[in-house]
Curated annotation (Swiss-Prot):
GO terms for cellular component: cytosolic large ribosomal subunit. This is Large ribosomal subunit protein bL17. GO terms for biological process: translation. The keyword Zinc-finger does not apply. It comes from the Bacteria. GO terms for molecular function: structural constituent of ribosome. Part of the 50S ribosomal subunit. Contacts protein L32. The keyword Ubl conjugation does not apply. Pfam families: Ribosomal_L17. Belongs to the bacterial ribosomal protein bL17 family.
Length: 131
């Protein structure tokens, strides 16, 4: 039986863990790629993927739920105007977790978390140069 195997504690209290995952999800929504430890990346996936699924259907109730989870209006706007339409046809699996070696100080396994189908950096740089 798998009772009680819900989530990783990550050596934090529940409020600290909630705040950390909220900050990490906001950073991921802003930059679309972040570097963190592997266990944090796996927990982050359980927070961000339902958020993007909320963003696929734009209504007031979903916007309020997303605001309750991110506490930032700018990210809610980006979630429903950019990310929701981008992943409208994809049935889940919005994040890619790539193993990224080990941290020098404590040898912790690191991971690169990125949104799938994100615009390439070269395309964004080319558009910025034209403007």
């Amino acid at each position: 039986m798998r009772h009680g195997n819900g989530l990783r504690k990550l050596n934090r209290t529940s409020s600290h863990r909630l705040a950390m995952l909220r900050n990490m999800s906001n950073s991921l929504l802003e930059h679309e790629v972040i570097k963190t430890t592997l266990p944090k990346a796996k927990e982050l996936r359980m927070v961000v993927e339902p958020l993007i699924t909320l963003g696929k259907k734009d209504n007031l109730a979903n916007r309020r739920l997303a605001f309750n989870r991110t506490r930032d209006r700018d990210f809610v706007t980006k979630l429903f105007t950019e990310l929701g339409p981008r992943y409208a046809t994809r049935p889940g699996g919005y994040l890619r977790i790539l193993k990224f070696g080990f941290r020098h100080g404590d040898n912790a396994p690191m991971a690169l978390v990125e949104l799938v189908d994100r615009p390439e950096v070269e395309e964004t740089a080319a558009v910025a140069e034209e403007a």
